[in-house]
């Protein structure tokens, strides 16, 4: 698998994400600039956490206009795999890759803590190394992580199996306890928890490693569950 991490001005999880994918999961992973307009060399493109362009206006609202986003739309439309984590999730919703929106947390506070998740769909490119019902603990760090969608969209997400991760104890008010969703075709995932911060036992556990191992399995056809 060859992956790219888009490093926007204000991104602060780009190096962490590259490290998790390259040094822990063992895949190729480049950092690329938001001015890049050709993504055809990659199997997976990752949009990291942080505060892209200072999150002025609102989270992800400026990053969505970066030149790389047009290339990312073409990449996703051609079936390439895209994952947005935290601010990356916000960027993907702003740019229309994913349904719904991320609002201020229910209590209007920035939340930085480990949270419990359950795996709702283990049949995606991002979750095939888990099993339905698996309990995960991943860190969150966000002020605008409260997932909102209208009732019709929420019903479609549930019916289509697009909810991949769900909070066990909802920390931020997200509707249906949603922590991570895919697009309708299943090749784009947005999630607020940070899997890249949970890939080593010494640093908070390895529950997030399965996200990256799933992508390796999807793109290379190699089941790497034994490495977890």
Swiss-Prot record:
Organism superkingdom: Bacteria
PROSITE patterns: GATASE_TYPE_1
Keyword Protein transport belongs to the record: no
Cystine bridges: none
Main subcellular location of this protein, as a coarse class: cytoplasm
GO BP of this protein: 'de novo' IMP biosynthetic process
Pfam families: GATase_5
Pathway: Purine metabolism; IMP biosynthesis via de novo pathway; 5-amino-1-(5-phospho-D-ribosyl)imidazole from N(2)-formyl-N(1)-(5-phospho-D-ribosyl)glycinamide: step 1/2
Tagged with keyword Cytoplasm: yes
Assigned keywords, A-Z: ATP-binding, Cytoplasm, Glutamine amidotransferase, Hydrolase, Ligase, Nucleotide-binding, Purine biosynthesis
Catalyzed reaction equations: N(2)-formyl-N(1)-(5-phospho-beta-D-ribosyl)glycinamide + L-glutamine + ATP + H2O = 2-formamido-N(1)-(5-O-phospho-beta-D-ribosyl)acetamidine + L-glutamate + ADP + phosphate + H(+); L-glutamine + H2O = L-glutamate + NH4(+)
Active site: 86 (nucleophile), 194, 196
SMART domains assigned to the protein according to its UniProt record, in alphabetical order: GATase_5
E.C. number: 6.3.5.3, 3.5.1.2
Alphabetized PANTHER family for the sequence: PHOSPHORIBOSYLFORMYLGLYCINAMIDINE SYNTHASE SUBUNIT PURQ
Protein name: Phosphoribosylformylglycinamidine synthase subunit PurQ
Organism for this UniProt entry: Lacticaseibacillus casei (strain BL23)
